[in-house]
């Protein structure tokens, strides 16, 4: 994806030096956007190999409403381990807000159900979206992620926080807003997960997956990722792979990792980098 490499270069070339919550330091730009037509392939980076199993299983986990890392660990995903309590709890993070947003009368709202239903029954609606930014549960920045989770708060606030759908002539496009985007580690995963979700929703609603748009707020590269970014920028993008979904499950919640196949993924070696905690 040429657009992604251009964004990487933009951040390291034009980014302002800033401090951050983790104490690592970043170079950051504000308010960026790129688009990808899914007819041109599945946006899994080819300039470094990505672990598609982690991307798919994390999305499946979030859609299930689960907020404990036990299932992730059992399915080969470790990306949330640093923020969980000793019992694996993350507090009311993504999945709970997506599928069980609390209401004043003690009930909950499933935003994913709303999105699927509206895509099927009123695809011209301008209200087809879901998000995870529930101010009541945002973490106290003076406390650790584990303390926040124990106190009923989110271990981390949502970074990829708002998803909106747009339907035209039977084609589904999705836009994602990311308030805080780690361009080297996080953004490639978020982009692929958005594309996967678009394919899943399109299949469930008998639509054709069309375009994804990623909009980022604080768009940053950590100071300890600069060498890795230079390595990636020196590589040449290859042809993107294709996504095959092998069956149509009964609902958006019934997909399994084995339902997905990435065909023709030819990527350069992965590039290791430390996560800022």
Swiss-Prot record:
- Annotated dUMP binding lies at 21, 126-127, 179-182, 190, 220-222
The record, for InterPro entries, names: Thymidate_synth/dCMP_Mease, Thymidate_synth/dCMP_Mease_dom, Thymidate_synth/dCMP_Mease_sf, Thymidylate_synthase
Task: Give the top-level enzyme category.
Answer: transferase
Q: Name one Pfam family in it.
A: Thymidylat_synt
This entry's Gene Ontology molecular function terms read: thymidylate synthase activity
Spell out the catalytic residues.
159
What does the record give as its pathway?
Pyrimidine metabolism; dTTP biosynthesis
Which EC numbers characterise this protein's activity in its record?
A: 2.1.1.45
- Locate the residues binding (6R)-5,10-methylene-5,6,7,8-tetrahydrofolate: 51, 182, 276
Protein keywords: Cytoplasm, Methyltransferase, Nucleotide biosynthesis, Transferase
Q: What is the first-listed, main subcellular location in coarse terms?
A: cytoplasm
Instruction: Report the subcellular localization.
Output: Cytoplasm
Q: Cellular component per GO? A: cytosol
- GO biological processes: dTMP biosynthetic process; dTTP biosynthetic process; methylation
Which reactions appear under catalytic activity for this entry? dUMP + (6R)-5,10-methylene-5,6,7,8-tetrahydrofolate = 7,8-dihydrofolate + dTMP
> What does the function comment of this entry state?
Catalyzes the reductive methylation of 2'-deoxyuridine-5'-monophosphate (dUMP) to 2'-deoxythymidine-5'-monophosphate (dTMP) while utilizing 5,10-methylenetetrahydrofolate (mTHF) as the methyl donor and reductant in the reaction, yielding dihydrofolate (DHF) as a by-product. This enzymatic reaction provides an intracellular de novo source of dTMP, an essential precursor for DNA biosynthesis.
Q: Tell me the subunit arrangement.
A: Homodimer.
Q: Which family does it belong to?
A: Belongs to the thymidylate synthase family. Bacterial-type ThyA subfamily.
The cross-references to HAMAP family, in alphabetical order and at most eight, read: Thymidy_synth_bact
List the protein's name.
Thymidylate synthase
């Amino acid at each position: 994806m040429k657009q992604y490499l251009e964004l990487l270069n933009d951040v390291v070339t034009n980014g302002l030096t800033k401090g951050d919550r983790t104490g690592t330091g970043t170079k950051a730009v504000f308010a960026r956007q790129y688009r990808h037509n899914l007819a041109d392939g599945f946006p899994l980076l080819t300039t470094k190999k990505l672990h598609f199993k982690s991307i798919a299983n994390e999305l499946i986990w979030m859609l299930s409403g689960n907020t404990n890392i036990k299932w992730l660990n059992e399915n080969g995903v470790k990306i949330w381990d640093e923020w969980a309590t000793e019992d694996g709890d993350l507090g009311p993070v993504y999945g709970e807000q997506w599928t069980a947003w609390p209401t004043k009368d003690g009930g909950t709202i499933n935003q994913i159900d709303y999105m699927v239903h509206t895509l099927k029954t009123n695809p011209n609606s301008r209200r087809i979206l879901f998000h995870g930014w529930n101010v009541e549960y945002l973490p106290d920045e003076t406390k650790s992620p584990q303390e926040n989770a124990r106190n009923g708060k989110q271990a981390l606030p949502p970074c990829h926080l708002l998803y909106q759908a747009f339907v035209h002539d039977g084609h589904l496009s999705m836009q994602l807003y990311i308030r805080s985007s780690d361009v080297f580690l996080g953004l490639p995963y978020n982009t692929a997960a958005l594309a996967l979700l678009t394919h899943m929703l399109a299949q469930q609603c008998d639509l054709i997956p069309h375009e994804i748009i990623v909009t980022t707020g604080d768009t940053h590269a950590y100071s300890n990722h600069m060498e890795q970014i230079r390595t990636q920028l020196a590589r040449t993008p290859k042809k993107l792979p294709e996504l095959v979904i092998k069956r149509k499950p009964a609902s958006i919640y019934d997909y399994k990792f084995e339902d997905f196949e990435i065909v023709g993924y030819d990527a350069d070696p992965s590039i290791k980098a430390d996560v800022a905690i």
